[in-house]
Amino acid sequence: ISVHDLGILKDDEIKVNKFYKKNQNKFDIIISSGGSSFSSKDYISSFLSQNTELLFKYVRIQPGRPVIFSKLKFNYYFSLPGNPLAVFTNLFFLVSLFIDPSRKDNSSITKFYQSGFSENKKSNLTKFYRVKLSKNILYTHNSKGSAKLISLSEADGLAFVPEGNDKIKKGEKIRFIEF
């Protein structure tokens, strides 16, 4: 795999359109962060909607929304949220599985541990928690803001509770993926 940093793109419609047109056949995959919402000022999502085949444009994970995955001929585009933890979650669970399909899913690296916390969550989302593992119990980081990278750098891994569950009870077994 060869990786190229294409720099920071100004949030300008003309520059975004030129950038994507210039690079659309140069790379197998282009991954960007920021500009993936569908507001009038999100020029990346606008360009991808108009010029590529949208494979999906939302995921039901937190942190992680919104995400665009699209295709044009043999080129693929991932437009990830601007939030750093949402970018990490999507890179770990979506992009890496796309790049390395032999992994199929994360079940081979998933373990179950007891939750050291209780929390209500939206039942229509899979939620990821940055956690510390201590004596076989998972604890969330004190810093819960999704833009706070310290919680990721100090975490042992991600615990996740799938869609369909609206709460986590202390002592309940939950899934954990160690970094």
Regions inferred by a protein language model and the residue ranges of each:
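Flexible glycine/proline-rich
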Residues: 50-179
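Helix-rich terminal scaffold detector
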Residues: 1-80, 84-89
